[in-house]
């Protein structure tokens, strides 16, 4: 990637002098800057633009880092092969005529992919504009622009859109750290670029225009890794695109691409925006270290009508208007005219001077119910727009609550906006735009907060017996079925700790009567058929049966009705089920396989109207308690189940338990293509799955990897093992979990000064919640932390931690080990380092390294015994390194 994006030598394959040609434009862009050597390649020319032209890349006398290919598509595979033989590691294919041209073009892409794998080169494109990096004077594109250096990395899959935005940015004096057009993304994709610019010190924020994600697992891993430190802003079109596949389940029908992408972006800490016009505004404001802690906005305005417009925009976008406290109203009374609005929006009236504005803003800032302030100015009254702007800038510098401004009008307002722009304070010409920006800030902060939340520990069985269930699925497929019946689906749920209503599948009326008498009236009858997914649609459900006579009548009527409506369907029997006498709420909990992001989980309002109300949210497994709660909170039905019109509130903790258990089931079973629990019924404090259906993915039965259906690596239970210290004390070695934050905090707080300095190279008195969360909530693809857990009489505690963090090139990893003072010299440090070496081997790393205090003789001795080389460094440090391959 370094050769690709920071080359010293570049070959332009297809260079020409023809005016207006791509080959000439690319060459002119590259030679405009003298920082690197550029070699034209064209077998038909001896010279191009006064430079020697080479017939092939193999004739160039030096090693080339980057080749830019601008020749016809049919000749590209052979040229990529030639580049590979010449040792060229980076290639940009600008040429078009690949998959966008049909099957023949797709075949050319497949050839290039095989060649790329053979030589290990990295390729951007094909069908792209190229790459621009202003800070290093690299313009390997055919765009006739040279953007100024800046702090925004803009990556676009669409060349036309990328070109237009770049042109607009040039006019608006916006600079870039990088512009890249990715085209068809046969190799380098968004995940690769995020990794690269995430490590780039010139990049402060990352903007993406995405049509397709590429490697979703790589994208999620990269985005989660850098979203904490650099805002990632995404535009992904296709909000109303319907899935081309006919879904069997409600979940499959509802959870479309838009919702799945939305869930992925939230999980990664990425902010999604809807309009291109918002891209650069979002990039600027999201860098702010002061993001709103909540959605509640106070509006201070000198025009009541504009305040109403701002309020409408806020409510339409699901924001909240702050309810000012009685104390705030009282304080405002002392500063406002007698006939002021006495509420939010705070109308300071048209004759307001600067002091009245300032007093209103300060009162709102001191109100705990205010998370941010929108200040609106219209050109009237005594307040001069530029002087008022300067006072607001002073206030904004002293508060952690964001202040956004709207200066409406022409020349006078422009003077105030200039003050804000000079001082990096968000300012807009319309209240709608300002409100939208505030809510982007809130959503981004909320997404980041999710990364920092510590989940509560739930008593969910993390490893229930499952192999007999996999045998059940295999038998089902062998029978020629891909749809589990209700009873089989409930078997999966029950074994994972999810409460289900018991069903009796009966073959005749006598069996049905016996089952009803055993379970007790009232009962429900449901048709059982491998050909019928939605029973209600064919009249296949009868409720409220209270007697033997009623059951006899309804049993026969049920079968006749279904045969009339679905004469081709095979009827396997009739299910008899105890009926809930009162259902307070009906929910749906389901899963489906998305073509890009693997299996996703859906929660929402259930029942027969589930696809009409469409009140649901989507999340990516695996889920913990925090993520389960967030999944519920994003629906309207969550407010209802808090208690509604005399109905009792649901047991939210039990629902969290059920959702996490369901997530575990989905993680363990790649064989599940779609699954619905509908309804998941709540009656008082009781929760039960009344109906369930499961669609099997036959292809997944032969999958070599148990987690290919997931884009977020689940908890790596294979590293869990009991182990004894030298003194015989037994500990549990296992990967760290987000729930471990309290135990890690306790361990760090009880360490000696020497132990802390040995790990952190400085005296550390207090570690923030955010940092502890970062230590515990890790991406198991890119990092591993093994903890030693000691179980004492009434509690568990951590006594040691070994960690390896993998570099973004996935070739090496840095390790560190910390053992509690009370448990040193007992073999634990040696064991942790050895486990980290094994993990590095498994992940295919080439080397493991660490930085150790030279005075830490014990750790250096362990490293030498395990085969590390030790090299002294300045400042009393030593570098230890172990080459694995």
Task: Tell me what each language-model feature is.
Residues 689-694, 878-880:
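Generic detector of short, aliphatic-rich beta-strand segments that form the cores of beta-sheets
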Residues 698-885:
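Long, contiguous binding/interaction regions
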Residues 1-691:
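Catalytic-core regions of core metabolic enzymes
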